[in-house]
Amino acid sequence: MEDVFTAGGALSRTLPDYEPRPEQAALAAAIDRALSLGEHLVAEAGTGVGKSLAYLVPALESGQRVVVATATKALQQQLLTKDVPVAAAATGRDVDVQVLKGRANYLCRRQLQGFQPFLLPDGRDGAAWEAMQGWLDTTETGDRAELELEPSAALWAELSVGPDRCSGRRCPFFSACFAEGARARAAEADLVIVNHALYFAHVASGLAVLPEHDAVVFDEAHRLEESAASWLGGRVSRQGLRRLAHDVERACREAQRPVPARELDRVERTGERLLRAVAPPAGRRRLREVPPEPALVLMDALGDLAAALHGQGEDLDALSRRSLAAATEVEACLELGPGRVAWSEPDALAWAPVDVSAELRERLWDEGPTAILVSATLTAGDDAAFVRRRLGLDRAREAVVGSPYDFPEQALLYVPRTMPDPRSDGFTGRAADEIVSLLGLSAGRALVLTSSYRALDAYRDHVRGRVPYEVLVQGEAPRERLLERFRAEVDSVLLATSTFWQGVDVPGESLSLLVIDKLPFSAPGDPLHEARCEAVELQGGDWFRDYALPTAMLQLRQGFGRLIRGHADRGVVAILDPRLRTRPYGRAFLAALPRCPVAEDPAAVAAFFGDRVAVSA
């Protein structure tokens, strides 16, 4: 493998524009060693290292069966269509690679047979159904990702099934099942690409979902704790209860059995009563206690429904088990303690473990295959101790390789001198004025990452009409469509929050200014964050130093990483939060970021961009 990453090596011969990077070769060597010795590895690779090829090449060279688990579908597609073919060509390996997704991503032939399109409303779903007709006749995979016009969640739910609704071998369409076909192909593959959620479902199922494998690479590993918490937690939602009732009615019709109308009505009424009893005014609200009486009544109603369905045939037996599983989720919300947190949402009741480390240690790290964790942000401070502690990964080597980019030449960090405290009422308005001024200096070409949806709305209202650039806003179009427009319309501005802090890759001039309004501390009152801070205190730690600060540092590094995506990129990161300068922990944030010049005068930004004329705020 030594010559693959060198000048004139296999990758240079495969990719005409390949640039050898010592950091990529070092990362590949560390991964090769881990695979050879069967050791877990936590590897941080700075932006631009080319981490995908750095793990794919040693994975293919090892001859082992490897699973790659990602957090996003975009990375799955990139691996399948771009990176794996390059790695295979460079290593001379004839590799069988398959992407495997959860069942709900595949068309269900049985659901399709019973679908009644005349019930579709006019508009988007009607158009989506019409557009699907040719695809239904020609698709070989049934994968929703093939569709050019995205159906709504409600429409796709009518045409697909999750694992809790699948009849398995009892289904008359089992031999032609798209999901089973995908699993069969994955069982024969050398390399299987999945997402974090499906890998954790594999662990939860007693290793029954994926083929046996020697190693797993967790790419985008900075998101593993949240993925694991979601897997280990549960929820009871208004939509889920309605879906259960819908499936019961449909299965009864198909089996020519009487619909248990009384039991279904009671589940609907008691579910609605519980959800209304805990509903927050907005967002998420932590529940120190779930009202026991409405919860117990809903559990009883679900038990009665399960009893009414039991023994009525295989499909109704499956729905009986699903009803009991829903009752178990409600019961879990009642059993709160130091290790579990529950919260309410406008349409759901949810719970999650506060700490996933013990479960991951026992079920994955101690008993599972060799694990390689890769991300651009796994160290908070000098090492990956924080992330390893959160994940329960006690025995693992660490590798840290920096970015090949020249940040002192390519980037400028701007922290304005006179911003108010971010917790004050005047901050959002002052930040909006600063954003408008900066957009004048950068000629648009900006991504603005906000701390909340409220701030997003305020900046949208303030910026539109004050700058001569197209202003794109998260929520006004699907994520990928927004990113496509942002890349194509070079002087456009994208305002976003939440998921846009990571996984956004916009090389070139379209992203020349990155604005971050506040240091990304979790919002006060976030149930899971609050419970984790309390758990740290109970264990004798300091909630801020040992959890809140390193978590925010990792998030800020993710946001910063959106700016420089290539050797030719140049740009400014503007962080409008004065705490970066005024609080002692500001030095920790600055030390965590790539080294580059820091300025507090907008004249430095103007000079960086070539003295463009500012737009009046």
Language-model features: locations:
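A substrate-engagement module of RecA-like helicase motors
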Residues: M1-T14, T47, Q64-D190, G283-R286
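A contiguous, basic/glycine-rich beta-loop/short-helix subdomain that forms a polymer-engagement track
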Residues: A157-D190, S205-L207, D304-M419, G426-D433, ...
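Conserved pre-motif I regulatory segment
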Residues: M1-A43
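Signature of the SF2 helicase/ATPase Hel1-core->accessory helical subdomain module
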Residues: E61, Q77, K82-P85, P163-D164, ...
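Walker A/P-loop NTP-binding motif
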Residues: D32-R33, S52-R65, K82-A87
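Conserved RecA-like ASCE P-loop NTPase motor core of nucleic-acid helicases/translocases
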Residues: V66-T72, I372-V374, G444-S451, I575-L576
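Conserved helicase motor "Helicase C" RecA-like lobe of SF1/SF2 P-loop NTPases
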Residues: S451-G475
